[in-house]
């Protein structure tokens, strides 16, 4: 019997797998392996208990086949599943359920070159169309695919170069530095860069600080950790030593570290640096003084306004509180805040002492503010307080209700409240946008008049000879349906946008009317398509049917829908005119509506002229042939 060939997928123990990994490692790093790791015969394998060369080949084949199997599973099952699930999630998240958007996400999320392929198919193709429209030569498809292949090769070779660079980094020679001796093959230690440290308390830990040095430190009089930083350095072998990084770190020439260069620069810094630091400090103090002055001035103005609007008793109380708040400078406020935060750790006596000092400072500033008021301003404030105190309880209650009502109203975003004198302007702005009814309904009125005139001329039955006339009649009615639909759509969109300026109850009533308009629009669209399909089917088959009765039903449906739309339009406009908030700027409201609908009105007017011309021509031709 012949020798049976061992199966490639046999069992592999852990020792064999470890040996195979070591074998591959030595092969890749091009370093000679140890004698017992590479065996050439089964005898040596039995002596050293290592797998033979044939077994190593079988192990490599088994690993390779297993990798191919896993790769096939990933390519044909795992990757498509992940791409499809992610594409569906993105469509759900963006609420865009189109095949093009789903395909774009599949291509974009493909590993390695998916994003590049997406840009090539959709982005660069659109640029090519725009270039052809502008008369510029667009990139060819062959060059785009070549660019894709080159990009993929660059990515793969870049990854391989990075891997081999890390493997063979230790085999490169280091060039000689400036002023240093050329060295033979020296390799840096993988533990970290070579560092120099000074003997003493400062070993370079504090030398990496980027904070600017103080003026005091330049004279060399500072002590503590910064004393060694500002001390002059020497290049002698006694003061600088090398850290022991192993045998591979020997032979390095001495180099200055970052901290040593910074120390020398601080020691020998030019005069303009000191002047720059001094000037910046002076400017900061001046800016702080200006800020304090502006805050004190604004606080005094606010204090006068508060005093003028309050009764004598409440004015005195709020005067004390405002003066205490205004008298605190930013520095004193910060100090008081720190004192309040640290009150848990401080003793009670210290807290009481700080509170007493703050109260004393506030009292002094209050006296200064009171003394700074002129007799005239004090008299005016007293008169204002007396006028407010003389109000009857009824008028005070009315003013209180008015103030509460103005606070409960919520203003829309990007719109500021206005005074009552500007309310008519807001009303005029609304009338301007709601007055579009006249120009928009002219189209439907003309169509309705033409359809009424043609109603008596509709033939009772249709044969092949009347097909052209029937096409014009059904086209006219379809155009009237289109005009009704556009009028409904445009006005409903305006009503929906104006609803954001209304109170919730009125907005709810307006939404019910908008739902009715949507129902009428859908009804007209569905029934109109049915009549059109009936006409097309009978005209193609050249069969007689009650064309006049069918068109009358279609016309009655249009009249019914138009009557319902007009009724709902008036209800919606009355709700808007009665309940929209009047305290918003007229210009901002107009800008908002113009921004939302910049060309709808103009497009409708252009469409109106075209429809009028077409309807008149169709009417004249139909009357002439009949």
Curated annotation (Swiss-Prot):
Keywords: Membrane, Mitochondrion, Transmembrane, Transmembrane helix. The chain crosses the membrane at residues 71-91. Its main location: mitochondrion. Residues 179-258, 309-351, 390-419 are annotated as: Disordered. It is found in: Mitochondrion membrane. Coiled coil: none annotated. GO terms for cellular component: mitochondrial membrane. It is a single-pass membrane protein. Residues 202-217 have a biased composition (Low complexity). The keyword Magnesium does not apply. This is Uncharacterized mitochondrial protein urf-N.
């Amino acid at each position: 019997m012949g020798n049976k060939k061992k199966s490639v997928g046999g069992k592999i123990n852990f020792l064999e797998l470890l040996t195979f990994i070591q074998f591959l490692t030595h092969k890749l790093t091009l370093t000679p392996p140890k004698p017992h790791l590479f065996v050439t015969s089964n005898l040596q394998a039995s002596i050293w208990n290592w797998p033979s060369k044939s077994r190593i080949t079988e192990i490599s084949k088994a690993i390779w086949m297993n990798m191919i199997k896993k790769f096939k599973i990933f390519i044909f099952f795992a990757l498509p599943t992940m791409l499809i699930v992610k594409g569906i999630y993105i469509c759900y998240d963006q609420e865009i359920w189109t095949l093009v958007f789903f395909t774009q996400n599949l291509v974009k999320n493909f590993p390695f070159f998916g994003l590049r392929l997406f840009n090539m198919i959709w982005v660069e193709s659109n640029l090519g169309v725009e270039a052809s429209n502008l008369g510029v030569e667009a990139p060819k498809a062959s060059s785009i695919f070549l660019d894709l292949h080159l990009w993929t090769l660059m990515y793969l070779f870049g990854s391989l170069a990075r891997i081999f660079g890390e493997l063979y980094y230790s085999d490169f020679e280091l060039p000689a530095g400036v002023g240093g001796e050329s060295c033979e093959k020296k390799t840096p230690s993988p533990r970290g860069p070579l560092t120099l440290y000074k003997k003493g308390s400062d070993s370079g830990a504090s030398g990496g600080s980027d904070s600017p040095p103080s003026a005091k430190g330049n004279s060399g009089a500072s002590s503590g950790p910064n004393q060694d930083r500002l001390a002059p350095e020497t290049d002698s072998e006694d003061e600088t030593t090398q850290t022991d990084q192993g045998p591979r770190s020997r032979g390095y020439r001495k180099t200055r570290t970052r901290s040593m260069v910074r120390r020398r620069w601080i020691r020998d810094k030019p005069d303009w640096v000191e002047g720059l630091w001094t000037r910046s400090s002076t400017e900061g103090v001046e800016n702080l003084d200006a800020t304090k002055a502006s805050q004190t001035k604004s606080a005094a103005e606010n204090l006068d306004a508060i005093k003028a609007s309050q009764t004598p008793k409440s004015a005195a109380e709020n005067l004390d509180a405002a003066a205490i708040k205004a008298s605190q400078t930013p520095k004193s406020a910060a100090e008081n805040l720190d004192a309040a935060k640290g009150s848990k750790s401080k003793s009670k006596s210290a807290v009481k002492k700080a509170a007493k000092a703050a109260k004393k400072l506030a009292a002094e500033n209050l006296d200064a503010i009171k003394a700074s008021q002129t007799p005239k301003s004090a008299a005016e404030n007293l008169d204002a307080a007396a006028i407010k105190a003389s109000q009857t309880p009824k008028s005070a209650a009315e003013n209180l209700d008015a103030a509460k009502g103005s606070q409960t109203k919520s203003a829309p975003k990007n719109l500021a409240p206005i005074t009552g004198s500007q309310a008519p302007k807001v009303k005029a702005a609304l009338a301007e946008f709601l007055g579009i009814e006249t120009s928009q309904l002219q189209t439907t009125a003309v169509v309705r008049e033409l359809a009424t005139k043609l109603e008596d001329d509709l033939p009772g039955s249709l044969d092949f000879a009347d097909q052209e006339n029937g096409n014009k009649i059904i086209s006219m009615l379809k155009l009237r349906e289109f005009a009704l639909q556009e009028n409904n759509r445009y006005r409903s969109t305006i009503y929906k946008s104006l609803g954001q300026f209304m109170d919730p109850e009125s907005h709810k009533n307006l939404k019910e009317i908008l739902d009715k308009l949507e129902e009428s629009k859908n009804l007209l669209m569905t029934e109109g398509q049915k009549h059109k399909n009936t006409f097309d089917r009978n005209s193609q088959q050249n069969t007689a049917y009650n064309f006049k009765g069918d068109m009358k039903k279609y016309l009655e449906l249009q009249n019914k829908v138009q009557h319902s739309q007009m009724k709902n339009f008036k209800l919606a406009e009355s709700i808007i005119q009665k309940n929209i908030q009047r305290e918003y700027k007229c210009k901002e409201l107009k800008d908002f509506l113009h921004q939302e609908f910049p060309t709808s009105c103009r497009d409708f007017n252009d469409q109106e002229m075209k429809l009028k011309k077409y309807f008149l021509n169709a009417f004249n031709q139909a009357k002439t042939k009949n």
